[in-house]
Amino acid sequence: SKITDILAKLGKVLAHV
C-alpha cells in the first residue's frame, strides 16, 4: 500500500537523521 511505502520512507529518513 502507499501508506506502508510512505511510512517506510519516513522511518528511513528519521533513522538517517
From Swiss-Prot:
Residues the record lists as Valine amide modifications: 17
Main location: secreted
Pfam families from the UniProt entry: Bombolitin
Cell location: Secreted
The keyword 4Fe-4S appears for this protein: no
Molecular functions (GO terms): toxin activity
Superkingdom per UniProt: Eukaryota
GO cellular component labels: extracellular region
Tissue: Expressed by the venom gland.
Assigned keywords, A-Z: Amidation, G-protein coupled receptor impairing toxin, Mast cell degranulation, Secreted, Toxin
Family recorded in the similarity comment: Belongs to the MCD family. Bombolitin subfamily.
Function field: Mast cell degranulating peptide. Its mast cell degranulation activity may be related to the activation of G-protein coupled receptors in mast cells as well as interaction with other proteins located in cell endosomal membranes in the mast cells.
Name of the molecule in the record: Bombolitin-2
